[in-house]
């Protein structure tokens, strides 16, 4: 543990359901003036950053849907899928035009309802799709939600560590409201990366890496990954993080596992005034 602290490798503790509990990390680094500028930048341009972030998030949902539709011809004529694509496209337009964070939150909630309303259709050849009706958490009530919650937590941990590494304050965000104990900027950053986690979850399910035997149902009704399920998921997650993807801003291939750090570094450059705008990650642009 001491060596990890010296090398600034975070050690995270999670509950069996994947909820973050605590972390061991080295001394906080970074220029205090960068954090002051972070506050100023987010106060001045927070709404525009949030609008771009949500537009990217909805675009990534559309990309995930289109990838599945491309591979499964029967979905091309599915009325619910067509309607969902239209709704998310309209969500992008509304996000770009809205004039307040409160309005943006409403648009995000509506788009999330649309997306997860058809999410089970993206799960092909695995009967766990039948257990998913809508997004639920704390606790997750079905296997698909259990995996989603676990993966989102992994992404959140990576984003928080990445932001701290580049010297930004992960607790001062531009979209998620400041709340004691919540890493609001990590919550912001993870929004553009959720699509990666969701595609990973779909791969696990569609290739039947995860099945019914990898979950336990609690007396409370919560459905959680068991030891075998967590082991399978974490093994595949590490494999995923080592594979490379094209980054449209850097114009080179980078491992998936470094994307939180790449985006955090770009955000830090924006805060320092080295970039005119911060560009969220669009999955459709990671394909040459």
Give the ranges of each region predicted by the language model.
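Active-site helix-to-loop segments that bind/position phosphate- or nucleotide-bearing substrates
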Residues: 32-288
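Trp/Phe/Arg-rich N-terminal binding region typifying the photolyase-homology
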Residues: 1-45
